[in-house]
Regions:
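Terminal targeting segments of Actinobacterial cell-envelope proteins
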Residues: 1-32
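Solvent-exposed, non-transmembrane regions of membrane-associated and secreted proteins
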Residues: 27-157, 165-244
Length: 244
């Protein structure tokens, strides 16, 4: 009997079955895949936009506000001049918000407020200025993005101090009322005598306004204060007790 060699065994082994041919993806699967990729891309773009809106605009605005604030202080150091300067009229200090000093400029347009400052209203109801004998010093600032100078306005309570620093004087106001939510069209809160705050007669008031709820501009948050006293600025610009 002849021996069987390995080659003969291999010749007698069955051949492997051909690999099944892969079927291409159908139109529905392709569409779902493309849609998923678009969603991922949109999510990334949205995430970058949020970072830009809520962080990077703050960085840019704070730099610009600091630069403009330095110009105001340089102007003051140069000698006597009008309270209103090209770059701002002074600085707002609200200890309850914990954000240091906020430059105040004329106007409340986005072009003004986007520089990380507060602005006093020129319309629809013209703001009084701190040195006026009576009236309402009305201010607005962003709550989110672009410096977010009034982001913590909800931390202000009745009895808290609001201080405005001009070249020659410190104006110290005391908070007596707040309105956590009102229509963005409610301009009565800016009246010279803001009756919605409970005020009944002419005086020297201050009003802070910003958007609410946070990250929206649907409504307005309002805080009112009334002037308690005025202190002259000394040579060292020693702040009042409320800021120490």
């Amino acid at each position: 009997v002849a021996a069987t060699t390995d080659d003969e065994k291999q010749d007698e082994a069955p051949a492997p079955a051909p690999a099944p041919r892969r079927r291409g993806r159908g139109p529905i699967a392709t569409a779902v895949s493309v849609f998923g990729e678009l969603l991922i891309t949109a999510g990334l773009v949205l995430g970058l936009f949020v970072v830009y809106s809520l962080w990077w605009t703050n960085v840019i605005a704070d730099r610009e506000a600091h630069k403009q604030g330095n110009r105001v202080r340089d102007h003051w150091a140069a000698g006597p001049g009008s309270i209103d300067t090209k770059d701002g009229i002074g600085f707002l200090h609200v200890p309850a918000m914990g954000n240091g000093e906020v430059l105040v400029k004329a106007g409340t347009s986005h072009k003004i407020l986007n520089d990380g400052v507060a602005g006093y209203y020129k319309d629809p109801i013209k703001s009084a200025l701190p040195e006026d004998k009576e009236g309402n010093f009305t201010l607005a600032a962003h709550r989110d993005g672009h410096g977010a100078k009034f982001h913590k306005i909800d931390k202000i309570d009745k009895g808290d101090a609001i201080v405005f620093e001009s070249r020659d004087k410190w104006y110290i106001y005391k908070v007596y009322a707040k309105l956590p939510e009102t229509s963005k069209y409610n301009v009565k809160v800016l009246n010279p005598v803001p009756k919605e705050s409970g005020a009944k007669k002419p005086g020297r008031y201050i009003t802070l306004t910003t958007c609410t709820p946070v990250y929206t501009s649907r409504y307005r948050y309002v805080v009112w204060g009334e002037l308690e006293r005025i202190e002259k600025v000394d040579g060292k610009r020693t702040p009042p007790a409320e800021l120490k």
